[in-house]
Each structure stands twice: as C-alpha cells, then as structure tokens.
C-alpha cells in the first residue's frame, strides 16, 4: 500500500446527452480501441431503442437494469494452511456498480443480435425486467456466496 494513502476517487464527467455519470461509465465500458464516438453512438442508440421498445425514460431503464444486476455478495479466494477457500464477502457500492456495468456489456457482446446497439438495448431491457444473462450471473454469484457461507469466518 502506498505511504500517501489510497488514491483519491476520480469523478466521472457527465455525458452531453443525458447528463448522467452512469451513461458515461457505460460508454467507457463499451469503448474499444479508443473509438469513443463509436461507443457513444452505440450507447445512445441503444438507450433510444430501449425508449421506443418500452415507452419509458432510458435513464430509468438503465438504472433499473444496473440495480437488478448489482451483486451484494461475492466470493474471494483465501489460502489457509494449504487449502484455498472461497470466502464470501460483501461488495462495496462502487464495485457493485462497476461489476454490473461490466456484466451488462460482457453479456450484451455474447448475444446473437446483428449489431452491438441491438444487443446492448435488448440486454438492458431484459435486465431491467429481471431477465437476461447478466441477471443470471448475479444470481450465480450470490448462489456461490451462499453455498460457501461456512467459510465466512475466514473473511478479512
């Protein structure tokens, strides 16, 4: 650990269209090879498509999707006397949001629709309705933490 203490948290800029740091974080997750304008068009078109598909405000859809995918528990490996245990630990709020965005984009990329815009739009709509692969990933993570509850006394 550095002597100066932990590095200060940087505030994300708000995006120009919605004025939300969550949308900026989503754009940063979609970003590949420094092509920010492409990532922005993918995210904005996906949010507009979600508005047309559901008739709801895109920011509400995004927020609900993130809330449905955020994990509250995860397992971390801990080595104790030659054995490695999967120890369940609580997830900090900032990490849970980061994981939710990561899983949404990861599972959107694995979908079978033709364009990334369609994939992201459908994954966001599914996640906001409590469906989709990203929500399943959260449930699997919670199930893993629940099944390893016996090792909770090893947490640090």
Curated annotation (Swiss-Prot):
Coiled coil: none annotated. Keywords: Ribonucleoprotein, Ribosomal protein, RNA-binding, rRNA-binding, tRNA-binding. InterPro entries: Ribosomal_uS7, Ribosomal_uS7_bac/org-type, Ribosomal_uS7_CS, Ribosomal_uS7_dom, Ribosomal_uS7_dom_sf. Pfam families: Ribosomal_S7. PROSITE patterns: RIBOSOMAL_S7. One of its GO terms (cellular component) is small ribosomal subunit. GO terms for biological process: translation. One of its GO terms (molecular function) is tRNA binding. Gene3D superfamilies: Ribosomal protein S7 domain (1.10.455.10). Part of the 30S ribosomal subunit. Contacts proteins S9 and S11. HAMAP family: Ribosomal_uS7_B. One of the primary rRNA binding proteins, it binds directly to 16S rRNA where it nucleates assembly of the head domain of the 30S subunit. Is located at the subunit interface close to the decoding center, probably blocks exit of the E-site tRNA. Belongs to the universal ribosomal protein uS7 family. This is Small ribosomal subunit protein uS7.
């Amino acid at each position: 650990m550095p002597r100066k203490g932990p590095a200060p948290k940087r505030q994300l800029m708000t995006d120009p269209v919605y004025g939300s740091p969550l949308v900026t974080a989503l754009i940063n997750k979609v970003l590949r090879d420094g092509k920010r304008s492409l990532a922005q068009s993918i995210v904005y078109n996906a949010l507009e498509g979600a508005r047309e598909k559901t008739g709801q405000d895109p920011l509400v859809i995004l927020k609900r999707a993130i809330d449905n995918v955020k994990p509250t528990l995860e397992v971390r490996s801990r080595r104790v006397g030659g054995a490695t245990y999967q120890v369940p630990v609580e997830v900090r709020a900032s990490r849970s949001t980061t994981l939710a965005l990561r899983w949404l984009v990861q599972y959107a990329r694995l979908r079978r629709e033709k364009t990334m815009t369609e994939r992201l739009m459908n994954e966001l709509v599914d996640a906001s309705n409590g469906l989709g692969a990203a929500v399943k990933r959260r449930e699997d993570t919670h199930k893993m933490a629940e099944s390893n509850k016996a090792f909770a006394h090893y947490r640090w």
